[in-house]
């Protein structure tokens, strides 16, 4: 009889213990699934997962940020020609393309069932409501010279502040090395020119390359001062493109029109008469790295370009 009572008591205790264990696991799973943080962005305040697992990123500079922070997105926008950029391609295996930066594919995004979407107000404000209906959505503000601000924002959103601080410190160390090693070159007035289909632009202070040159300490020609974005010029204003050194880059979409514009202008007698051209100080650089990609990986590669040219004595 005593054995029977003891067995009954032990069985009851085991059952209670198992139920409690199951209850705790259920509670833990629920808490884990529902744990969110409030993030304030340019669109307001949003509740997002504390540690998102399935992120869709809608800007190319954002793609670079995520990869640098150790976060592989489930979906990302492609480069302007519909392919991954060469400098990030190897890290994007198995990532699903979701359209281009200026025209994300909402159906492709929804099919991935993301738990977080990261976009940009300048690019995606018109589809914000639709994105928000798919998953929690946050936006950086603009895409111009503010890549560092955006990078810090992405690090905050992804709960990767330590990784972000480390990456920026490494970038700034490279900047400081150039400043130190080539301090006698910092008075060089650098001109930035971009050729596009039907357009020629001078890139000013509030551009990706412009902010990096300023951070290093390089000067700009008198015609390229200030913090504006770009000046579009015709050949009658070619003198504004002159400088001690010129870096030019061409926005080519695969139809040959950007390259045709470059060829036309480079062969023009007025262009050839610029002092920077006559002194053989006009250098073509990669448009993706110096402008279009616009992220931390491109920034580091631009520094590498400058460092290499300086060490080779090109300017």
PLM regions with names:
Residues 54-66, 165-219:
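Basic- and aromatic-lined ligand-binding clefts that recognize polyanionic substrates
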Residues 11-17:
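Bacterial N-terminal signal peptides
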Residues 1-9:
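Bacterial N-terminal signal peptides that target proteins for export
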Residues 113-118, 136, 243-244:
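Proline-aspartate-enriched helix->loop->beta-strand connector
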Residues 126-197, 293-315:
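Extracytoplasmic substrate-binding proteins
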Residues 61-108:
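A short, structured surface patch at a secondary-structure boundary
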Residues 245-315:
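Structured C-terminal subdomain patch of bacterial secreted/periplasmic proteins
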Residues 5, 18-34:
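Bacterial lipoprotein signal-peptidase II cleavage site
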């Amino acid at each position: 009889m005593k054995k029977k009572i003891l067995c009954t008591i032990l069985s009851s205790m085991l059952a209670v213990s198992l139920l409690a264990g199951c209850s705790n696991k259920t509670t833990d799973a629920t808490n884990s699934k529902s744990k969110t943080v409030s993030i304030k962005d340019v669109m307001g305040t949003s509740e997002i997962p504390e540690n998102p697992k399935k992120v869709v990123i809608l800007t190319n500079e954002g793609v670079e940020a995520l990869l640098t922070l150790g976060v592989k997105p489930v979906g990302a926008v492609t480069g302007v020609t519909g392919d991954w950029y060469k400098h990030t391609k190897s890290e994007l295996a198995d990532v699903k393309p979701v359209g281009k930066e200026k025209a994300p594919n909402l159906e492709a995004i929804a099919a991935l069932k993301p738990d977080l979407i990261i976009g940009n107000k300048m690019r995606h404000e018109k589809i914000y409501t639709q994105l928000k209906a798919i998953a929690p959505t946050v936006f950086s503000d603009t895409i111009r010279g503010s890549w560092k601000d955006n990078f810090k924002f992405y690090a905050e959103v992804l709960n990767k502040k330590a990784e972000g601080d480390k990456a920026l410190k490494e970038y700034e160390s490279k900047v400081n090395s150039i400043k130190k090693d080539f301090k006698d070159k910092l008075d060089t007035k650098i001109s930035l020119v971009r050729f596009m289909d039907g357009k020629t632009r001078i890139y000013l202070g509030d551009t990706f390359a412009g902010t990096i040159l300023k951070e290093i300490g390089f000067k700009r020609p008198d015609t390229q001062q200030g913090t504006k974005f770009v000046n579009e010029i015709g050949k009658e204003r070619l003198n504004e493109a002159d400088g001690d050194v010129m870096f030019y880059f061409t926005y080519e979409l695969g139809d040959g029109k950007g390259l045709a514009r470059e060829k036309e202008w480079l062969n023009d007698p007025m262009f050839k008469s610029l002092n920077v051209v006559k002194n053989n100080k006009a250098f073509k650089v990669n448009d993706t790295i110096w402008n279009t990609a616009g992220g931390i990986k491109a920034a580091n590669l631009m520094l590498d370009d400058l460092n290499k040219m300086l060490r080779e004595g090109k300017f």
